Amino acid sequence: MPHFIDLGVNVDHVATLRQARRGQEPDPITAASLAEQGGADGITFHLREDRRHISDRDVELFVQTVQVRTNFELACAADVLAICCRVQPDWALLVPESREEVTTEGGLDVAGDSGRIADAIQMLKDAGIATSLFLDPEPNQIEAAAKLQVDAVELHTGPYALARGAAVQHELRRLADTGKMIRDAGMRLHAGHGLNYVNVRPVAAIDGMAELNIGHSIVSRSVMVGMREAVAEMRRLLDSVTIAAQ
């Protein structure tokens, strides 16, 4: 069955578990292979400036061994940009980054910092890498991204994932409205952050959604059922949305 919504699996937290003992296992490269077997359409990994989980060696091995699309998540930092341009993943996702944060806490401020981001985008484009931006579902940010002519925008779904009660529908509407802006501007619509097996279907059902990137919930589930099955379960959820829409 065709995968009308692509599933990108973020394997960062396999590396987080490895780093808890500063050892060699679990191996995120093996996890990526198992995710592919479970139905992942892409593998996402974030090489942070502090190298808290994914390592430079991991990045090299992902690009060399992953058979589906590779999605290199990074900040606009010169050394990491240079690594990305050298290893040439299929996609680069630019995100904000703070050493104090536990995980990415919000989208890029493209509207307020377009110069630095534009320079990073140009470097990536010159290297032949498709580019996307991680943005909050705010119209001014989408308008700024459209001017930079990126290939995709990944909407930050964290506020939706944390919402309760009536706020859930409010956040879904924000995602749907800005998603339409993204598609109308000719960019590919992606989304991610905080999505799990309970809350993913309404986001997957947003008109024109092309790709969801999901990490922590899949890695958490994999502790119980294995990576291949954890990814397959998420794949079935996304496929059920596609079937319902037909």
Curated annotation (Swiss-Prot):
Its main location: cytoplasm. GO terms for biological process: pyridoxine biosynthetic process. InterPro entries: Aldolase_TIM, PyrdxlP_synth_PdxJ, Pyridoxine-5'_phos_synth. Signal peptide: none annotated. CDD domains: PNPsynthase (cd00003). 3-amino-2-oxopropyl phosphate binds at N10, R21, G194, G215, H216. GO terms for molecular function: pyridoxine 5'-phosphate synthase activity. Its EC number is 2.6.99.2. Pfam families: PdxJ. The active site is at H46 (proton acceptor), E73 (proton acceptor), H193 (proton donor). SUPFAM superfamilies: Pyridoxine 5'-phosphate synthase. The record marks E154 as: Transition state stabilizer. The keyword Transferase applies. GO terms for cellular component: cytosol. It is found in: Cytoplasm. Gene3D superfamilies: Aldolase class I (3.20.20.70). Pathway: Cofactor biosynthesis; pyridoxine 5'-phosphate biosynthesis; pyridoxine 5'-phosphate from D-erythrose 4-phosphate: step 5/5. It catalyses: 3-amino-2-oxopropyl phosphate + 1-deoxy-D-xylulose 5-phosphate = pyridoxine 5'-phosphate + phosphate + 2 H2O + H(+). PANTHER family: PYRIDOXINE 5'-PHOSPHATE SYNTHASE. Belongs to the PNP synthase family. Catalyzes the complicated ring closure reaction between the two acyclic compounds 1-deoxy-D-xylulose-5-phosphate (DXP) and 3-amino-2-oxopropyl phosphate (1-amino-acetone-3-phosphate or AAP) to form pyridoxine 5'-phosphate (PNP) and inorganic phosphate. This is Pyridoxine 5'-phosphate synthase. The lineage of its organism: Bacteria, Pseudomonadati, Planctomycetota, Planctomycetia, Pirellulales.
